[in-house]
């Protein structure tokens, strides 16, 4: 079977840029009691790099457990969740299922978050972790929850991902949690102008515009209140009326908590082409291409230390020129150094275990 080649003849619908919250010592997930006000208990959940959607349900379950244990001890009934990206929304979902009163405080709501700019493949990319056992649990819980949501309006579907080289992010899953996803199948890639040796993986596609909207809508239906608020420092967080606070602010955590680990912005670009229903596969490891209901997503890039969310036309064109060459419908051009798959970017895109803080 030959898979259809993407149509690159029409200009992009739009270009987008988002900023991944990459934490040098691994993502942070822990509960702490405030030294200045012992009644305040803060669960920190941030620094997930490019793996936010992939890990979301898994880390949210661990956040919920910390909140439940604290509420059982203190008899608090109200919880503040800071942030309305995928980490905040999934955490709020599981916490409100405990019967607690949840209020989400956020500077930006779901349409304007980094999560909304994500490509959506389930593959834990560009993230460091410090506890292998907990990370395995996160992977298992997250994947199985997404898998159970197929066909329920969450924008989740199973997909083949064709790659010309091993995919290190999916291989992490294969190696750490055998059997969670199928092992990759070596094969000649099934494309008219790209019949080189490669691999076929099987994973999930989570479409952020559908998934985030569904979470947001369900929370509103369950009487979770949303309030727009910016937190400038730790004092502004501790001034909240809730005693249990869940910090899912991503890069915003730099402003509100003392953290010795580097929390670094990593800018990524996407180009969105018109949706093409005939494309039912994913492609990665030499450029990536994720056909979704709203668009065909072309990515991605990796600019370390850049906090800007402004798309750059020249970078967008580089992405398009490169992927056209890969699929044999344009001149072959070298992989841009800014591309996430370029070897120079590996120190910041690898998913690996570190000694965490």
Where are the regions a protein language model picked out?
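Dinucleotide-binding Rossmann-like beta1-alpha1 core, especially the glycine-rich loop
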Residues: 120-195
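Active-site substrate-recognition segment that forms the wall
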Residues: 1-38, 47, 53-55, 61, ...
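A non-catalytic, amphipathic alpha-helix used as a structural packing/dimerization or gating element
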Residues: 137-145, 214, 318-322
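Core beta-strand elements of the Rossmann-like FAD/NAD(P) dinucleotide-binding domain
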Residues: 236-244
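Helix-loop-beta segment of a Rossmann-like dinucleotide-binding subdomain
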Residues: 39-48, 128-132, 155-161, 181-214, ...
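Loop-centered beta-sheet repeat module
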Residues: 223-228, 244-251
């Amino acid at each position: 079977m030959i898979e259809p080649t993407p149509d690159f003849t029409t200009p992009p619908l739009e270009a987008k840029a988002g900023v991944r919250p990459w934490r040098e010592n691994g993502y942070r997930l822990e509960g702490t009691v405030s030294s200045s006000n012992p009644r305040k208990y803060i669960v920190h959940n941030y620094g997930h790099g490019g793996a936010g959607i992939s890990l979301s349900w898994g880390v949210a379950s661990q956040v919920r457990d910390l909140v439940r244990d604290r509420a059982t001890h203190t008899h608090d009934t109200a919880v503040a969740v800071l942030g309305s990206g995928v980490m905040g929304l999934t955490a709020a979902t599981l916490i409100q299922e405990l019967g607690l009163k949840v209020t989400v405080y956020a500077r930006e709501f779901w349409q304007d978050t980094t999560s909304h700019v994500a490509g959506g493949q389930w593959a834990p990319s560009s993230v460091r972790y410090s506890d292998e056992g907990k990370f395995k649990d996160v992977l298992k819980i997250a994947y199985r929850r997404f898998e159970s949501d197929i066909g329920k309006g969450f924008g989740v579907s199973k997909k083949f991902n064709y790659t010309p080289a091993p995919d290190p992010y999916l291989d992490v899953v294969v190696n750490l949690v055998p059997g969670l996803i199928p092992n990759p199948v070596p094969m000649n890639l099934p494309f008219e102008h790209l019949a080189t040796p490669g691999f076929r993986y099987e994973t999930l596609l989570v479409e952020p515009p559908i998934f985030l909207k569904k979470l947001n809508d369900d929370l509103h239906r369950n009487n979770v209140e949303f309030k727009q608020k910016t937190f400038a420092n730790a004092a502004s967080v501790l001034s909240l009326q809730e005693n249990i606070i869940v910090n899912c602010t991503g890069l915003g955590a730099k402003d509100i908590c003392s953290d010795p680990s580097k929390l670094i912005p990593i800018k990524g670009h996407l180009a969105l082409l018109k949706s093409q229903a005939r494309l039912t596969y994913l492609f990665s490891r030499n450029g990536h291409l994720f056909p979704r209901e709203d668009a065909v997503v072309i990515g991605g890039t990796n600019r370390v230390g850049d906090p800007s969310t402004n798309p750059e036309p020249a970078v967008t064109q580089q992405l398009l020129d490169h992927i056209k060459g890969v699929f044999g419908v344009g001149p072959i051009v070298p992989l841009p150094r800014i591309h996430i798959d370029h070897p120079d970017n590996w120190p910041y895109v690898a998913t690996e275990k570190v000694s965490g803080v």
